Amino acid sequence: MSDKEIKLPIDTSLGKLPQKEKGSLLPIECKSPEEIRRHQLERLAAGFRMFSHFGYDEGIAGHITLRDPEYPHYFWVNPFGMHFGQICISDLILVDRDGNIVQGEGKMLNTAAFAIHSRLHEARPDVNAAAHSHSMYGK
């Protein structure tokens, strides 16, 4: 199965979200795949910060993935070794179904994240995001 040609790099340079800011709860109308991706990656980065805020991060353990809206056999994941509270859009890694880093060279892919989430995203095309965390509550 072949994907359409990937236009790389995908712009993630403006991905620095403030630690705390009020956002809109209203749905956002995104017209292009790039706008949809940007919106979803902003929410993913915010999700990492929320997990951190509520204590769902034990050291560097855990991962959250998001299926790419334009290339459904690819997903975004946090790099290994980066604390959830520090993650920005530009830190995220785009990985294909074979574990190849498509975008985010120089960053370390968490092999456990890939092993778990690649199977989940392959088996459940209706699932766009998944999370796995270690917290003080799980001890």
Regions found by a protein language model. Give the residues of each.
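An anion-binding catalytic pocket shared by soluble metabolic enzymes
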Residues: 41-129, 138-139
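Extreme N-terminal flexible tails
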Residues: 1-35, 40
